[in-house]
From Swiss-Prot:
GO BP: any one term: diaminopimelate biosynthetic process
Gene name for this UniProt entry: dapB
Keyword Amino-acid biosynthesis: yes
GO MF terms, alphabetically ordered: 4-hydroxy-tetrahydrodipicolinate reductase; NAD binding; NADP binding; oxidoreductase activity, acting on CH or CH2 groups, NAD or NADP as acceptor
Keyword hit for NADP: yes
CDD domains with a match to the protein in the record: DHDPR_N (cd02274)
Keywords of the record: Amino-acid biosynthesis, Cytoplasm, Diaminopimelate biosynthesis, Lysine biosynthesis, NAD, NADP, Oxidoreductase
Record function comment: Catalyzes the conversion of 4-hydroxy-tetrahydrodipicolinate (HTPA) to tetrahydrodipicolinate.
Name of the protein: 4-hydroxy-tetrahydrodipicolinate reductase
Gene3D superfamilies tied to this protein: Dihydrodipicolinate Reductase, domain 2 (3.30.360.10), NAD(P)-binding Rossmann-like Domain (3.40.50.720)
Subcellular location: Cytoplasm
UniProt record similarity statement: Belongs to the DapB family.
Residues annotated as binding (S)-2,3,4,5-tetrahydrodipicolinate: 163, 172-173
Amino acid sequence: MAHPIPVVVNGATGKMGRETIKAIAAADDVTLVGAIARSADVQGQDIGEIVGLGPLEVPVTNDLEGMLCLASQEREVPVVVDFTHPDCIYDNVRKAIAYGVRPVVGTTGLNNEQLQELAEFAEKASVGCLVIPNFSIGMVLLMQAAIQASRFYDHVEILELHHDQKADAPSGTAIKTAQMLAELGKTFNPPKVTEKETMPGARGAVGPENIRIHSVRLPGLIAHEEVIFGAPGEILTLRHDTMDRSCYMPGVLLAVRKVRQLTGLIYGLDRIL
């Protein structure tokens, strides 16, 4: 019988971290071996008790390198799932790769230069790494539908809406959507007039191939995206709404299982489906 995949969760007490702990505990082929969080008031506490599952015998620690070192000694190839913060994610991934622990990154905010550097580092180390801005299967389907629609429309804008604790804007999912549309090799939104913003930023950020991205941050939201196409006489709106973070867990578990089979960095859930 195969041994379960050892998994460390970094950002274990955050919203996504808690859902990931629950998903790992419920799965038969993965096992939680580490839980990392920065908050001083949870150090040493059982992560199972914190998330409401009862004892899992996994104490919370803030020692990332120490936990990566321990995980690297597991019989099976270990994985670290990271839901932390844009300010530390680059260093977190480099440390994981250095210890041979396969990173599954749900934290957004990495820029293109950082992604390229991490890709080169992972390739040299022959370590698989997955950077996934959105783990929802429905979101992947929205992106694919947007690609099909963009063949017939020259005008498109992206609206992304998230909870008010999200640190980066625009979201990694919106950027990924714009990048996928831009890969078609066409320039969108040919100008009709000379625009003048009376308030800077009113028309949103200009992404690749002139695709504008608009960000909303409000309490009450979780994660939502609209891709809006326009043509004379009609509007086509594609929308995905996250109602509960549990919708991400099938994608998270899929990534945990897949990343150990890879060498190098892959960006986007669509690349492993």
